[in-house]
């Protein structure tokens, strides 16, 4: 029992630490798109911060507010996205690299999701799911 509690605590704290600092700004039902909701979040990356591989239960549009991010979807080459630029991810994309391109400056993203109501926007992936 104690081992299970320790495992769950470590897994929970590890998952939260693996995606940058996420701040939810808004969630809103989309009445013209039954069963869907829109969500807006910011994600702050400390200098050199790397997120764990993940996917999203959503179509998402990502605008880089500050700094630069190196991003790579499974099957694609890495790309560097700078402040003022936008990229897109589909629900089937596996995001294998997401990291702040700078070791000295923070980076900040503004993320717009369109997703099924009630589903978590982000799913962290284990080794076998990448």
Residue ranges and their predicted role:
Residues 35-40, 59, 76, 92, ...:
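Extracytoplasmic
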Residues 8-17:
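Hydrophobic h-region of N-terminal signal peptides that target proteins for export
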Residues 26-59:
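N-terminal targeting signals for Sec/Tat export/insertion, comprising classic cleavable signal peptides
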Residues 1-7:
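Sec-dependent signal peptide recognition
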Residues 30-34, 45, 75-92:
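Short acidic-glycine-tyrosine-enriched beta hairpin
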Residues 58-75, 83-85:
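Glycine- and acidic-residue-biased ligand/ion/polar-headgroup-sensing regions
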């Amino acid at each position: 029992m104690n081992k299970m509690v320790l495992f769950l605590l470590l897994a929970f704290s590890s998952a939260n630490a693996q995606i940058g600092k996420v701040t939810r700004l808004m969630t809103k039902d989309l009445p013209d798109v039954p069963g869907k909701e829109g969500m807006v979040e910011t994600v702050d990356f400390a200098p050199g911060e790397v997120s764990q591989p993940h996917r999203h239960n959503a179509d998402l549009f990502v605008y880089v507010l500050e700094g630069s991010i190196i991003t790579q979807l499974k099957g694609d080459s890495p790309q560097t996205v700078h402040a003022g630029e936008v990229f897109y991810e589909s629900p089937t994309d596996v995001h294998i690299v997401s990291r702040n391109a700078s070791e000295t400056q923070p980076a900040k993203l503004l993320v717009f999701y369109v997703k099924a109501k009630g589903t978590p926007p982000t799913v962290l992936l284990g080794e076998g799911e990448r």
